[in-house]
Amino acid sequence: MRAEARHQLKEDRFSKATLQAAEKTVHWTQEHQSKLIAAAIAVLVIAAIAIGGWYYMQQQDEKASLDLAAAVRTLETPLRPAGTPAQPGFDSFESLTERATAARKQFQAILDKYPSTRTGKMARYFVGLTSAQLGDNAAAESNLQQAAGSSDSDLASLGKFALASVYRGENKDAQAIDLYKQLIDKPTTVVSKVMAQMELASFYESRQKPDEAKKIYEQVQKENPSTESASMAQRKAAALK
């Protein structure tokens, strides 16, 4: 198979996988972000690992990909009820903080060891996410800002989307709004226009700006007739006071 054909096949497979991941994160809101980070974003990462390892065939990036897969598994490890002892032979964590701390350490090690690889850059994104989960906003901002500035449009959009959530938590409203609008203007396969619109509308609702939120919900309905997104936007608009 010629190099161009292999490249196109890789791009087609990556687009399909990342689109599926994006669809799974449509309902991601700031309130339950920590629950969906591992489940939804891991779909994207595992797909990228499989395709990236096959396409580049570079030993260093393959090793980094294996390490990243292990770190993602840590981030998805189940939590056990408080006061319940760990079961021998079954990985678990007692709290979100304990799990995020362990995962961040793994992601940081990948970033330190493979900073110039695509996998290393993805690890930086996860360092930002886990830092946000731990309330380390300075580290979250620093790492997510770098991810948001990536030349990889998919990684950049994920970085912006997560960074906007961090800004929301810090009441940096202007910065959050700007990022959502950037994503609306230039959507990607992993962060669609609808995804960014719904998050911006949710943000306006949280700031008691129902008129602004309603405008966006109406726009979503107009641009996406007869879709689940339109139905969701209609319900949310109807619930506004």
Segments predicted by a language model, with ranges:
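N-terminal positive-inside, membrane-proximal cytosolic segments immediately preceding the first
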Residues: 1-39
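Short solvent-exposed coil/turn linkers within tandem alpha-helical repeat scaffolds
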Residues: 112-120, 148-156, 184-193, 207-210, ...
